[in-house]
A protein has these predicted regions:
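Structural motif
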Residues: 116-117
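Short secondary-structure boundary segments
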Residues: 125
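C-terminal helical cap(s) of enzyme catalytic domains, especially alpha/beta-barrels
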Residues: 1-4, 130-153
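An alpha-helical appendage that flanks or caps ligand/catalytic pockets
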Residues: 3-112
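Positions that flank functional sites
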Residues: 20, 128-129
């Protein structure tokens, strides 16, 4: 990133390495697994580029040239089509796309990003994708625990 900034005539020291990542968390690995294997989480995978799908051994249902969410036109997809597209989404793809696990797991994953130069993380709670509204709302507690832990990194 710093090389690209320098090549573009920008001061590389003025660039803050940042990323926007979704978090799937819960009080147990079972809660995390329930969320990440939900239809809603799998539908989110349609936003991921074909290249990322291919790295997990599957073809993106919208084609090999699909570059991500900016190419997705959701109003052209009906429910049966989406359900057919997501039936083969590998959980490994979702685990690669999200920070996942218990609060301690997610904080450890964020620390790896920090150790590779990240200085600003925008964490979004995707744990609300759980099939149960009650459990979706309850996911805020471990997510807030993560936010408190991230402040200490």
């Amino acid at each position: 990133m710093k090389t690209a900034a320098s090549d573009a005539g920008r001061d590389p020291t003025c660039i803050t390495p940042a990323v926007w990542l979704f978090v799937v968390t819960g009080r147990s690995q079972q809660e995390v697994a329930e969320t990440i294997s939900s239809e809603a989480a799998k539908a989110f995978a349609l936003n991921l580029p074909a290249e990322m799908w291919a790295s997990h051994g599957v073809q993106h249902p919208l084609g090999d040239d699909f570059s991500g969410g900016q190419d997705l036109v959701p109003q052209t997809l009906d429910e049966p089509t989406v359900l057919s597209y997501i039936k083969d989404v590998p959980l490994s793809l979702l685990k690669d796309a999200f920070l996942t696990g218990t609060p301690d797991d997610v904080i450890d994953q964020a620390a790896e990003w920090r150790d590779h130069g990240l200085r600003y993380l925008v964490a979004r709670n995707a744990s609300i994708l759980r099939p149960s509204l009650r459990k979706s709302l309850a996911s805020n507690a471990p997510f807030f625990e993560i936010l408190r832990g991230l402040k200490k990194l």
